[in-house]
Amino acid sequence: MTTVLITGIEPFESDPTNPSWDIARALDGERIDGATLVARQLPCVFGRANRELVAAIEATQPSLVLALGLASGRSELSVERVAINVIDARIPDNAGNQPVDVPVVADGPAAYFSSLPIKAIVHALRAAGVPAAVSQSAGTYNCNHLFYGLMHHIATRAPRMRGGFIHVPATPELAARHPGRPSLRLDAQIAGMRVAVRTALATQGDLRLSGGTLH
């Protein structure tokens, strides 16, 4: 049986919800093209988040891992290209930790690329009417920390597994707490994630399309 692990993150920075977990939870138990989706919530706590991610991988033995996180301020599903080996926390995590300029993994490589077909996913999302783009930076907070931890685990312990990270926008209800922030309806985000999973399962390579930026 093929398993897809999809993770979301608990709420942080005073927000009552986190759409990344709302999406993952909505997809838990669904079957897409013969694969079963299994959802896990991860904490917004440095170190612990990656330990719980590895535990979830070991418990579920997925062939594909799709890690999700909130990027409040973005207006589209952002399929991340690269994870970097640094934590530079602008705000404390949910346990009060605020590491600055420390590596995610001591002596780890500077960066890892996603092993998802990022451009194929963006192309499929746009074709389905869901706003999406390739993102060149997952930031330096917990999302990048999780993304790097996932790719390090794949590189060192699970080379046949594929995985990557997608940042999701705020929902309208969440954006209303922060006037001026863009949003995307939760049902559209859930539908988009189904497209992302289906595309990742069906695509081993990637499309040769421009997804870069000028700055």
Swiss-Prot record:
Give the InterPro entries listed for this entry: Peptidase_C15 (IPR000816), Peptidase_C15-like (IPR016125), Peptidase_C15-like_sf (IPR036440), PGP-I_bact-type (IPR029762), PGPEP1_Cys_AS (IPR033694)
PROSITE patterns, per database record = PYRASE_CYS
Q: Which GO terms describe its molecular function?
A: pyroglutamyl-peptidase activity
Matching entries from CDD domains are given as: Peptidase_C15
State the EC number(s): 3.4.19.3
Family of the protein in this entry: Belongs to the peptidase C15 family.
User: Could you tell me what this protein is called?
Assistant: Pyrrolidone-carboxylate peptidase 2
Q: Which species is the source of this protein?
A: Ralstonia nicotianae (strain ATCC BAA-1114 / GMI1000)
